[in-house]
């Protein structure tokens, strides 16, 4: 296997507790490849900005050395967690972050419009996650995201991903909403029906 051709990626299973157990968030990809019209979990490839040393300084509870160790890497592990946060915010509007003073984000109230605007600008590459964190005095909540699997796309595929899978609890006071670009539909479902 030629590891040089593998594209590093992160995928997140977001769960929430319900009376009968738990639900997991699924998304339907848009008609754009890869994975057009498929139901998947939010995620995508690691961007260069996910590797930026500046964003690593805003990661609460985890540094690159610890993250890399958890993934069995020599370095660069934290970029997978950052990609999880960024992809979730871009694709479904969920932001794994808190105010620097420890206060939870409430993206259902008076700040919803402001964060919707940040999200639109992030998707269109007018701003990056680091800029949002600095502007709003945020820390990314890395301890809410845990790795649990590692898959590599089979050799038969033309585009191959080296994907780390993570699990995270959906934060309170945030409602998932598809972006209309990469994702055309979001759905919370029981894992047995996923």
Identify the meaning behind each predicted range.
Residues 4-24, 33, 38-52:
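Conserved N-terminal beta-strand and adjoining loop/helix that marks the start
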Residues 41-43, 49-141:
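The catalytic Nudix box helix
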Residues 14-16, 26-28, 167-169:
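Short, well-ordered beta-strand micro-motif
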Residues 31-33, 46-47, 152-153, 172-173:
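Short, solvent-exposed loop/turn segments at secondary-structure junctions
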Residues 2-9, 17, 28, 52-56, ...:
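Macromolecular interaction modules
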Residues 186-194:
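Conserved small/polar residues in nucleotide/adenosyl-binding loops
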Residues 1-4, 30, 154-157:
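Short Gly/Pro-enriched turn/cap motifs at secondary-structure boundaries
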Residues 111-112, 118-184:
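Glycine- and acidic-residue-rich phosphate-binding/metal-coordinating active-site segment common to enzymes
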């Amino acid at each position: 296997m030629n590891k040089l051709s593998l594209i590093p990626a992160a995928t997140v299973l977001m769960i929430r507790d319900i009376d009968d157990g738990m639900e997991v968030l699924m998304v339907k990809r848009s008609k754009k490849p890869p994975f057009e019209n498929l139901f998947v979990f939010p995620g995508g490839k690691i961007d260069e900005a996910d590797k930026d040393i500046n964003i690593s300084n805003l990661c609460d509870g985890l540094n690159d050395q610890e993250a890399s160790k958890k993934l069995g890497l020599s370095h660069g592990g934290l970029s997978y967690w950052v990609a999880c946060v960024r992809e979730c915010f871009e694709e479904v509007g969920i932001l794994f972050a808190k105010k620097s003073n420890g206060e939870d984000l409430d993206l259902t109230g008076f700040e919803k419009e402001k964060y919707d605007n940040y999200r639109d600008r992030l998707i269109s590459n007018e701003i990056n996650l680091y800029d949002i964190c600095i502007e709003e005095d945020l820390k990314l909540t890395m301890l809410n995201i845990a790795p649990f699997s590692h898959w590599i796309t089979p050799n038969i595929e033309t585009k191959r991903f080296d994907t780390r899978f993570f699990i995270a609890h959906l934060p309170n006071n945030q409602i998932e909403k598809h972006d209309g670009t990469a994702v055309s539909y979001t759905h919370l479902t029981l894992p047995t029906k996923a």
